[in-house]
């Protein structure tokens, strides 16, 4: 497999940038990816928007599943993302992003 092992755990994570915007991404190593973002070597969107606050992350059994959740989260308006995180917590936020996909076993970690 070109991008890692089939049983590798991937994470969806949500950052708050210094300018108040949110960034959602996927990685198989949270610490490494945050370091990349802080050094300006992460996603283009986050360059020049440091420092960041990690609002949370959730594990998934593979890259494809993590990317599907990331896509759904990115399609939500910022105010909806923040309202979900503030009122019902991260588990429900991720479950809401999944909509029709099963949410069992997903834990959102602040």
UniProtKB/Swiss-Prot annotation:
SUPFAM superfamilies per UniProt: GIY-YIG endonuclease (SSF82771)
Domain GIY-YIG: 8-83
Pfam families listed in its UniProt record: GIY-YIG
SS bonds (residue pairs): none
CDD domains named in the record: GIY-YIG_UPF0213
Record-linked Gene3D superfamilies: GIY-YIG endonuclease
Domain of life: Bacteria
Signal peptide per UniProt: none
InterPro entries xref list: GIY-YIG_endonuc, GIY-YIG_endonuc_sf, UPF0213_domain
Coiled-coil spans in chain: none
PANTHER family from the UniProt entry: UPF0213 PROTEIN YHBQ
Similarity-based family: Belongs to the UPF0213 family.
Protein name: UPF0213 protein DVU_3309
Protein source organism: Nitratidesulfovibrio vulgaris (strain ATCC 29579 / DSM 644 / CCUG 34227 / NCIMB 8303 / VKM B-1760 / Hildenborough) (Desulfovibrio vulgaris)
């Amino acid at each position: 497999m070109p991008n890692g092992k089939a049983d590798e755990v991937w994470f969806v994570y949500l950052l708050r940038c210094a300018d108040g915007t949110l960034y959602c991404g996927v990685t198989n190593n949270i610490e490494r990816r945050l370091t990349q973002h802080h050094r300006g070597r992460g996603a283009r969107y986050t360059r020049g928007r440091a420092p960041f606050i990690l609002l949370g992350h959730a594990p998934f059994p593979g890259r494809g599943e993590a990317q599907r959740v990331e896509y759904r989260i990115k399609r939500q308006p910022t105010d909806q993302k923040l309202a979900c995180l503030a009122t019902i917590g991260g588990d429900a936020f991720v479950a809401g992003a999944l909509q029709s996909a099963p949410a069992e076993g997903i834990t959102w970690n602040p």
